[in-house]
């Protein structure tokens, strides 16, 4: 493996349901944000570079609230998830203002990823250190004869639900 794994953090969400930039709101009495715990765990697992995938509109608030602190511990790069960054032949539908999602975030970050093995997380979800250790191990382990390598850290659905309100979750069905 010639390049070290990088961590992409999707933080372009506008917080429309939440009512603000959830990415930069503290979650404990010490002012830590969920993203702080993720970056700490990722660093402990071996990641040395983080790519923040953000909207240009939140750049200043994000750099002030998160980036400047993280730059002391990790290599940091910022990329913008802008709606008009699309493959040839596609265009933004009239009235669309929200970011497209994970695949689009990765497309916007492709140049910064630069062929390195990578993992992508949401800025406002907590994953735990084990998730970062497992994905880092996967990204740094050569797979004999594999043209492409894919991995996903998944959780039992019942462990992702809460009694404290609505949670949007995805469901993955693995077919071998």
Predicted regions and their residues:
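N-terminal glycine-rich phosphate-binding loop and ensuing alpha1 helix
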Residues: 2-67, 71-76, 81
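Conserved small/polar residues in nucleotide/adenosyl-binding loops
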Residues: 172-176
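Conserved beta-loop-beta/alpha segment of the NTase-like Rossmann-fold superfamily
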Residues: 82-169
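Conserved hydrophobic/aromatic positions in well-ordered beta-strands
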Residues: 25, 170-171
């Amino acid at each position: 493996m010639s390049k070290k794994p990088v961590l992409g953090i999707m933080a372009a969400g506008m917080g429309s349901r939440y009512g603000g930039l959830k990415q930069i709101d503290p979650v404990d009495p010490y002012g830590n944000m969920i993203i702080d715990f993720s970056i700490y765990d990722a660093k402990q697992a071996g990641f040395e570079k983080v790519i923040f995938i953000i909207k240009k509109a939140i750049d200043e608030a994000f750099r002030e609230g998160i980036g400047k602190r993280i730059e002391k511990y990790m290599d940091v790069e910022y990329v913008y998830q802008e709606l008009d960054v699309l493959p040839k032949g596609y265009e933004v539908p009239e009235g669309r203002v929200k970011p497209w999602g994970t695949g689009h975030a990765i497309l916007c970050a492709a140049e910064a990823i630069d062929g390195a093995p990578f993992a992508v997380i949401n800025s406002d979800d907590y994953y735990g250190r084990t998730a970062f250790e497992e994905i880092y191990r996967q990204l740094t382990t050569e797979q004999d004869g594999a043209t492409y390598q894919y991995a996903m850290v998944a959780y039992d659905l019942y462990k992702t639900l809460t009694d404290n309100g609505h949670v949007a979750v995805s469901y993955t069905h693995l077919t071998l």
